[in-house]
Amino acid sequence: MKQLWLTLILGAAITTTAHSQGSAKPDSSSADPYLWLEDVHSDRAMQWVEKQNAITAKRFVQTPTFDALRDSVLEVLDSDARIPYPSRMGEYLYNFWRDKEHPRGVWRRTSLEEYSKPSPKWDVILDIDALGKAEGKQWVYRGAQCLQPKYERCLVSLSPDGGDAVAVREFDIPSRSFVKGGFQLDVAKSNVSWIDENTLYVGTDFGPGSMTESSYPRIAKRWVRGTPLSAAKTIYEGKPTDMTVSAYHTRTPGFERDFLSVVKDFYHSETYLLTSDQRKRIEIPDDAEMSVHREWLLIQPRSPWTVGGKSYPAGVLLASSFDGFMGGARDFTVLFQPDDHTSLASYSWTRHHLILDVLDDVKSRLEVLTPSRGEWKREPMAGAPGLSTIRVVETDPDSSDEYWLDVTGYLTPSTLERGVIGEGKAKSVKEAPAFFDASRFEVSQHFATSDDGTRVPYFQVSPKGMAADGNNPTLLYGYGGFEISLLPGYSGTVGRSWLARGGVYVVANIRGGGEYGPRWHEAALKANRPRAYQDFAAVARDLVKRGVTSPAHLGAEGGSNGGLLMGNMLTMYPQLFGAIVCEVPLLDMKRYTHLSAGASWMAEYGDPDKPEEWAFIKTFSPYQNVKQGESYPPILFYTATSDDRVGPVQARKMAARMEAMGYDKVWFYENTEGGHGAAADNKQSAFMRTLSSEFLWSQLR
C-alpha cells in the first residue's frame, strides 16, 4: 500500500489547507534574521520576491535568445503529436490533455478503436479552462476517482493554485456536470475513496487538531450521502505524530474488501482489514510494502525478514494467499529475489498475470508471472533496447490481461505499445515525435567511485566525436532520495534547451535513490545522508577525469530533495562546479519539520529537534553551513509561492542570507502558481525550463 500514498505525497494528488504553507509561526526572537520571509504572503515578503524576480528577469529573461528558446520549449510541451497516455476505465480510455488552446487542460475519453487511429476523436468530459472562466478561478486539475464498475460518478480534485491542497467535487460523466448537492470538500489536503454510490471514506481538515504534524489527514471517517461532513462516522483517529491516516475500499467483484492505512512515517506503516465489527492488523513488517489482488497478497519488505522459519532479504517480493495469511499461514512463494545488480522497480497486475519491472544496473526488463499453487510460471517479456527504459503504464486488472507499455531512451522518443498476455507480442499504437536531431548524439553508461569505494552509475548524453578536452558545457542532474530511481527517458525540452546548444547532459544514479532497491536508498538515510553528496561529487570528478568537462564548464541541477543536494554541492563542493540551479529546495534543515509538510520527511533526514539527530543533520544543512568569504559558484534558486509541500521560504531565506554575505552571483525567481512543480501550465513550465537553461548556458559555455 505504500506505493499508493507515496505516489500521493511525492506526486501531486493527496492534498493542508491552502494557508498552511508556513505551518509554524516563526519566533521573532530567534537569531535567524530572515524568519520574516517565512510569512509566505505578507506584503514585505512578496515585495522582496517581486524585487528579486525583476532582477533575475532583467539578467536572464530580457536577453536576445530567451523568447525564441522559450517558444521552442513550449512547442514541445504543447505539441499535438505527443502521446496521449491512456487510463482505462471500463470500455473507455481516458486522458488529461494540455495544449495551446487548453492551457489548463481537458479531461476526455475515447474508445480503443478510435484511440488506435492516427488522429482519434475525443469526447471532452471536463474543460478546466472553461470551468475556471465560468467560476472566476484558476483551477488546476489534480485527478479524478470514478466509481466502479460503471465509472459514471467521479470525485474530481481541483487545486486553486497548483499546490497540493485541493477542492473535491462529485462529477457526473453522463450529464457532464457537477452533482448538485453531491459530495464536496473544501480546499484541503484530503484523501477520499468510494465505498458505494452513496458512501465515501474521507480524510480531510475536519477542523482544529484533525491534521497531523505533517499536514495530512489524521482521522478517517465514513460519510453518507445527504448528511453533513460533521455527521461522518469516525473509523479511526491517528496520532498527531503519524504521517497520515486513510481508509479505502476495493471493488473487485467477489473480492470486495475495506482497508485502513496508518502511515507512521515515510517508510513505516500499519495496514488493517476492516470488517463490520472489527479491524484486524495485517501482520507484516511495518517497513514492508503490500498489495492485494483478488486472492493474492504480495509483500515486499524493506529490511531482512525472518518468518515461518525462513529468512528473506530486503527488496524480495513474496506472494501468499490473502485468506491463508490472515488465518495464520506463513507460506510464501518468492517472486523476485534481488542481487548486487538488480532491484524490483515496480509490478503490475492484469486479470490473470503479474508483470515485474526489473532494473539490472539501471536498465529495465520485464517478466510475466502466472500464479499457481506452487512455483509461479515465469516468462520474459521483450525488453527495452540498450540504455533505455520499458515500463508498464496501464493495465486492466479486474477485467482483462490487457497491458500498455512505454519504451523510451534519452535519444529515443517514446513508443506506446499495447498487448494482451497470451496473444503474442505487444504492438505499437502511438509514437512520439522527435524534437531534436538525435543522430548527433550518443548515450553511454559509466561508473564513478565514491569516497567509500562504492561504484556509482551515471548516464551521459553527449555529441558524437566530442573532444575530451574538458571544455564541454555539461549539466549534471541528480536527486538521491526517497528510493526514487532516475531512469533513461526522452525529453524534448532538455534536447532543445541544452543538447541542441552543444551541451552534455548527465544523470547521476546516486545513493538515496531506488536504482538498487532498499539497500541503495538506506545507505544514504539520516546520518548517512552525506554519502549521496559524496556520490554526486564523485560523478563530477569522474567527468573531469575523463576529459568530458572541467569545473568551470560543469553545472548541476536538482529539485526538492535534489534541491537539498544542490545546496550541499554549493557548501561542500563549490570547487567542482561552475554554476548550480537549485529548484523548490529544502535548505534550512533546522526548521524544515516546522515548514509545510516537512514533518513527513523525518524518516529520511532525521528530527532536528532532537539534539542527537541535529548533531548529524547540521552537517548537511546548507542554510546553516553557508559562510562568508567562500568561492561559491553562481547559483539560481527558483520556487513557487503556492508550493505547499516544501514551501518557498527555504529558497527565499538562503538567497537573502547569501546576498547579505556579499555574494553577487545569487539569483532568485519565484512563480506565484504551480505548487511544488513551480508551474501550473505548459507556458509556465516552458518559462521556468528556459530560465534555468539560460542561466546555466551563460555561466558554463
Cite the ranges covered by each PLM segment.
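Glycine-rich His-Gly loop
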Residues: 98, 408, 477-481, 560, ...
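Conserved beta-strand segments of alpha/beta enzyme cores
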Residues: 124, 234, 425, 504, ...
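Cap/lid segment of the alpha/beta-hydrolase catalytic domain
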Residues: 126-150, 157-165, 174-182, 384, ...
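Bacterial N-terminal signal peptides that target proteins for export
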Residues: 1-6
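Structured core elements
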Residues: 193, 201, 258-259, 272-273, ...
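Beta-propeller folds
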Residues: 7-13, 18-402, 406-423, 438, ...
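Active-site-proximal cap/loop segments of hydrolase catalytic domains
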Residues: 494, 501, 507-701
